[in-house]
Every structure is written in C-alpha cells, then in structure tokens.
Amino acid sequence: MKNSFLPSGLALSLFSLAMQAHAAGGHHAVDDAALLDVGKCKVEGWVERETGGARTLQHAGAGCRVGPVELGLNLDKEKQTTLDAATSFGPQIKWAFSLNDVLSVGAVASAKFNSQAPRYASSTLVLPLSWRATDTLSAHINWGRNFLRGGVGQPRGGVSFEWAPISDLSLVAERFREAANNSTRIGARYALTPDVKLDISRARGLHAGGVSWWTAGVIWEFDR
C-alpha cells in the first residue's frame, strides 16, 4: 500500500513555501493570509502624508510568530492641521492556514486604544483569503468589520493584486473600504535584502472630494 503521508520535515517545508507565496501586508489596507515563519519576528514602520499636508500619520509596529499565530503590537500618531496630534496603540493577533499550494485563509483581530480618555476606540475583525494564481501573480481578498466605540459598526474589506516581475520587486494594486470610504492604491515593494523590504505607494479616496496620500515604509524580519 502506498504511503500517503509526507515526512514531517517535507510537509513543513511545503507549508512554509505556500505561505511565503503570499506577500502583501505591511501598510497595505488589504491583508494577506500568511504568517511569519516559525522563530521569526518583525518590526515595521511607515509614514503617510496627505497631498497638501493636511494629515500625516506615523506608524510603528512589531510582531512575532508564536506557535500557530502571529502576535503584534501597533503604535500610531496622527496629526491633522486643525487638530492636536492623536496617539493610539493596540494589540493584534493573526492566524492563517494553507488549504493547498495556491490557497490560504486566515483571520486577523485587533483593538485600538487612545492615549487619552476615552481609552477604547475600536476593534476590528478581518478574514483574508490569498490565491497564488501563478509564480509571479497573487490576489488577496478581505472581508471584515470595524466595531467602533458606542456600538457602531462599519464594514471593511477589499481586493488586491500583487505582481512580482523580478524576484526582488513586487507591484501592488488594491481597492479597499475603510472608515466608510472607498479608496484605491498602487505601490511597489523592493527587497533590499531577504529580510529588509522597502514600500512606497500612492492612494486616493473615491468619494466626492476624496484626497490622495503617499506612504513610505520599511519592514525588517529577523530571527527571535
């Protein structure tokens, strides 16, 4: 009788390859259904600037793979010309599972707290799905909801396509819904080294009077 079970080391390697095939994340609104490798951590940061300078956002985040999930912590500082700077922070947990060599699903839950009262601001649940169409093209779909303080909820989600014409460069296009507004984004990610990636993108709101903004960021992965 033919043995249908893969050796554990080979199975783990195939699982890791399938998960690595999906690579969005970072500052992009549409998340991927992928986790850090076992034993890996990351730190990331990015800066957003609205065209005309009416709004800026500084983000710092860190995360580590812990068993079957990825645990993270986010810190944001947002400044608008007519308001004082607002600082928020919150934890995040992410789970992902490879259905086969081209499809992965997951779940991401996070919470946001203000540095000043009222502390609790919102929580979010997102269900990502990633599909590796070819060796160079991937698609990501998100369904989710924001649960705002006071019981008000907002749907969120989107779809993105990621194309890697060469091994060190990927191009991303996405359409997404956040904070009751629809927006689009195009961007590029360059791998400076296997563990350090640089991001740049431009996004634009699709609603009447929608503004545009630029984002530049960096992601560094390292062994724990």
Where are the model-predicted features located?
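Transmembrane beta-barrel domains of Gram-negative outer membranes and organellar outer membranes
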Residues: 22-224
